[in-house]
Each structure stands twice: as C-alpha cells, then as structure tokens.
C-alpha cells in the first residue's frame, strides 16, 4: 500500500505539493554585512513544511562553492552570491516572478 501525502491526500509518487509550493513561495535574496565587514547572501521566504530547506541549502552551497548555514527557515551563504543563487533557484523550479533579488 503506497504512502499517502498528509497535505494533498494523494499517494507519495503522485504528490505535487512540493512543485506547487515552489511556484507560490515569495523568496527574497539579499546581502548583509557580518563580522569584520564580510558579506553574506541570505535566501529567505521558504515554507519549511513544504520544502526541505536543509537539502536546498546543501545544493546551493555545493553549486556556489561556499560555506553557509540554515537559520530559521532561511539560508545564509558566505559571500555575495545573489545572481548565482537566483539562477540556481530558477533551475530548481522556483518561479522567476516570485524571486526578489536586492
């Protein structure tokens, strides 16, 4: 018996909750200064119930070749990676209209 998704009620292999969630999320990508004047790119606005933020952070860190962490449903990447992060999020299925890069 296949597992049932608790959100949509469909079997896990037919579930589209994550794809729908990717299209509806309003994601903000911005840079802040941290200790000693270092820059940090913050990717914020994920719904942690629908998207695996830790897995997404791992993919972003691997592709950007930088360090980073997950804090309160936001991803922090070391350095200025705004353009690269936007391109990666679009390739992962997030809507370009819903990504706000500052």
Swiss-Prot record:
GO biological process, one term: regulation of translation
MF (Gene Ontology): mRNA binding; translation initiation factor activity
Chain coiled-coil ranges: none
Entry keywords, A to Z: Protein biosynthesis, Translation regulation
Disulfide bridges in this chain: none
Origin: domain of life: Archaea
PROSITE patterns in UniProt: SUI1
SUPFAM superfamilies attached to this UniProt entry: eIF1-like
InterPro entries tied to this protein: DENR/SUI1_TIF, SUI1, SUI1_arc, SUI1_arc_bac, SUI1_dom_sf
Protein family (similarity comment): Belongs to the SUI1 family.
Entries under HAMAP family matching the protein: SUI1
The protein's name in its UniProt record: Protein translation factor SUI1 homolog
């Amino acid at each position: 018996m296949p597992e049932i998704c608790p959100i949509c009620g469909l079997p896990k292999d037919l579930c589209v909750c994550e794809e729908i969630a990717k299209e509806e999320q309003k994601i903000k990508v911005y840079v802040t200064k941290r200790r000693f004047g270092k820059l940090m790119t913050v990717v914020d606005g994920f719904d942690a119930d629908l998207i695996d933020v830790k897995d997404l952070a791992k993919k972003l860190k691997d592709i950007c070749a930088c360090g980073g962490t997950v804090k309160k449903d936001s991803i922090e990447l070391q350095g200025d990676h705004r353009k690269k992060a936007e391109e990666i999020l679009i390739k992962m299925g997030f809507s370009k209209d819903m990504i706000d890069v500052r």
